[in-house]
Amino acid sequence: MSYTQKVLDELKARYPEQPEFIQAATEILGTIQPALDAHPEYEEAALLERLVEPERIVMFRVPWVDDQGKVQVNRGYRVEFNSAIGPYKGGLRFNPTVTLGMLKFLGLEQVLKNSLTTLPMGGGKGGSDFDPKGKSNNEIMHFCQSFMTELYRHIGPNTDVPAGDLGVGGREVAYMFGQYKRLTNEWTGVLTGKGLSFGGSLARTEATGYGLVYFVDEYLKSRGDSFEGKNVVVHGSGNVAIYAVQKVAQLGGKVLACSDTHGWVEDPDGIDYTVLEHVYNQKRSGHDKGVTLAMYVDEKPNAVWHEGDGRGVWQLACDIALPCARENTLLLEDAQALVANGCKVVGEGANMPTTIEATTYFQENGVAFMPGKAANAGGVLVSGLEMSQNAEHLSWTFEEVDGKLEQLMRGMFHNVDDTAKEYGEEGNFVMGANIAGFLKVADAMLAQGVC
C-alpha cells in the first residue's frame, strides 16, 4: 500500500462524517505520490499525517439579536490549517451549509493555493452557518460584531488574516474590522477585502474573476491560441462570475450564459457584466428578498431566462466553461454534456466546483482542466498584496495591483505546467498544481522540525 493511500484510509476511518474534506484530501493525495517517491524523507517525518490535520480549530457560538428583538444563535468556526510558510490566510464563509468538514476541505485547499501564489501565506478558513440572505443591514452588523467578539482573540496581522468568501463581502468585512478595532484599540491589517477608505486594495473585488481569466488565457497562449472569438459559459453570477465575464469580453470572448440558484440566463449578444453587477448589488442590499438573476432580462430583452437548476448552462455548446459558484456544481453528466458540445477548456473559479468523477472525465477526453487551487488564486493573491500595502502604509494604483495580479497568475500557470511535465504528466494541471503547492509547504515543514 502506498504512503498516500495509507494516510487517506486513516482519514476516511477517522472522519466519516466529513465528506467534503475527504473529497479534497482524496483529490490531493491521489496526485502527489510521484513527489513522495522522489522524497522518502517526507514519509520518515510523517509529513502527510501532519499536513492533513489542522494546526488548530476554533469553534464558538455566535449569539445576536434580530430586528424583532429575538435572540438568535449560530455556530462560528476558524480552521487554522497550516502556518509553515506564513500566517494563516483564507476567507470567512457565511452560509447555512457551513460545517466543520466543509471548512476543513476549504482550509486544506487554501494551504496549497496560497503556496502556489509564491507569497508568504499559510492556509486557513472559517465562517458560520449564518445566512445573510434576506437579513437587514442592522442584523448583519449585529451578527458580524458578535462573530468578531470571539474571533478577535485568535487572529492578527502576523498570526491569522481572514478575508471574505461566500456570503462575506465588503460590508461584512467592514463591520468585523470595526469591531476588531473597537476591541483591541489597534488599527492593523488584520482583515483583507477592506474598503478603500480604510486600508483596502484596489482590484481586490475584481481579483478572483480577473485572475481566473488570466490563468486560462496563459494556457491558451501557451498553445498558440487566445480568448478571441471563443464562446464561454459561466456557472454563477456573484463576484467571481461578474469580473470573469468582464475580463473575457475585454480579451475578445463572449459569455453566452450565467446562473444563480433560481435558474440561468442566456444572452445571444453576450452577457453584459454591468447588468450582472447591478442584479448582484440588488441581491446584496437585502431590500427586496425576491431579487433573482431573472431581472437581467428586464434590461436585456434579447436574453432568455430559464427557471430551474442553474446547471442548465452546462448544456450549451461552448469552447470554455468557467464554474464560478460553489462546490460540486459540475457533475459527471454535466461534463459529458460539455464534452459532447465541444468544450475544450474548463477553469475553476470556485473552490472544488467539479466532482472528482467529472474531473476524470474531462482529463480522459482531452479537455484542459484548470483546478481551482491555481485558477482561482487571484483573490487570495491580491489579499496578500493588500497585506503588503498595509504593512508598508502604502496604497498602490489599480494598474499596479492588476499588473502584479496578471504577472503572478500567468507565472503560476507556467509553474503548474512545468511541474506536470517534470513528473511525466504533461497537461495534467491537477497533478501539477498539487505537487507544486505541496513541495513548498513540505520543505518548509521539514526544515522547521516536528511541530
PLM segments and residue spans:
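N-terminal ligand-binding/catalytic initiation module
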Residues: 1-202, 440-449
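Adenosine-phosphate binding glycine-rich loop
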Residues: 2-19, 24, 337-451
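Predominant activation on well-ordered alpha-helical scaffold segments within soluble catalytic domains
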Residues: 8-9, 26, 100, 104-108, ...
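Active-site nucleophile and cofactor-binding loops and adjacent substrate-binding regions
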Residues: 69, 165-166, 201-208, 233-237, ...
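General beta-strand structural signal in soluble alpha/beta enzymes
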Residues: 159-163, 187-191, 234, 257-260, ...
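Glycine-rich phosphate/diphosphate-binding loop of Rossmann-like nucleotide-binding domains
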Residues: 200-315
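Structural motif corresponding to the C-terminal cap of alpha-helices
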Residues: 216-223, 325, 329, 350, ...
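Rossmann-like adenosine-cofactor binding region
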Residues: 263-369, 374
